Amino acid sequence: MGAHGVKAVFFDLDNTLVDTAAAGRRAIEEVLPLSPPGPAAAVISVLQSKHHYGEGEARVICDKVQAKLLKECHDPAKMCITDLRISHWEEAIQETIGGEVNRNLAAECYFLWKTTRLQHLTLAEDTRGMLTELRKRVRLLLLTNGDKQTQREKIEACACQPYFDAIVVGGEQKEEKPAPSIFHYCCDLLGVQPAECVMVGDSLDTDIQGGLNAGLKATVWLNKAMTTPVDTSPVPHYIISSVLDLPAVLQKMEHKINANLGTDHMASSNE
């Protein structure tokens, strides 16, 4: 793209490039005896034989852990992510079954959930193809919030490193999205200006608001369900239902830029 166009695209990771939510659901199902045998078959067998969980109890535990993950607030200065998430399982089991706290079982559940989730985190072939083609024209950067260990493990699991010029994890920075500082840090990494960058992500509160806060050229909201945001939500420049729609959006932006340049040139020659 031209000097006045897009030089870099920043991508969110979770539920933008990889379906973390689906991987998490699959993993949480495999921890307890609710699904057909898979990578977790051995641990499921132990849970069934040693602890005699019924399906109803297992479902309640799963639901409680899922709710705790959704509301999770992690301060790495106070507790490591591993201890926090083992505590989620510990609390869910305690709240459902009662009796003495079983830290060992909670840890077993957590590590099985974590391992299984990572196994199900994949960068789809068509997404890899899109990134490969885009990188021939613009610089690409992966910008993800979250605990540094957790996010680096996800990045490794989905093997997305070769598709990006740089990768930035919020947990390794002073501030995360939507703070302007992390976006400006990304710009400096790539040697570009905010007005030459586009942010793509599924979160209005972090990806879109952050891109707006940092003065990026454009923000692209991935709205897979095509839901209607509340009136107070930040307004993205573009909305797509699939990340694969992004090249068409970038092409539309380029046409608009070229049209504006043509208009400016005509006005200048008529002066």
Regions inferred by a protein language model and the residue ranges of each:
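Active-site neighborhood of HAD-like aspartate-dependent phosphohydrolases
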Residues: M1-C62
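Asp-based, Mg2+/Mn2+-dependent phosphohydrolase catalytic module
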Residues: M1-V9, P37-G38, Y53, N104, ...
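A metal-dependent, Asp-based hydrolase signature
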Residues: S45, S49, V60-L112
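Short C-terminal alpha-helical element
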Residues: A107-Y110, A124, G201
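Surface-exposed cleft-lining segments at the edges of enzyme active sites
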Residues: L112-H120
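Active-site periphery "cap/insert" segments of enzyme catalytic domains
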Residues: Q119-R128
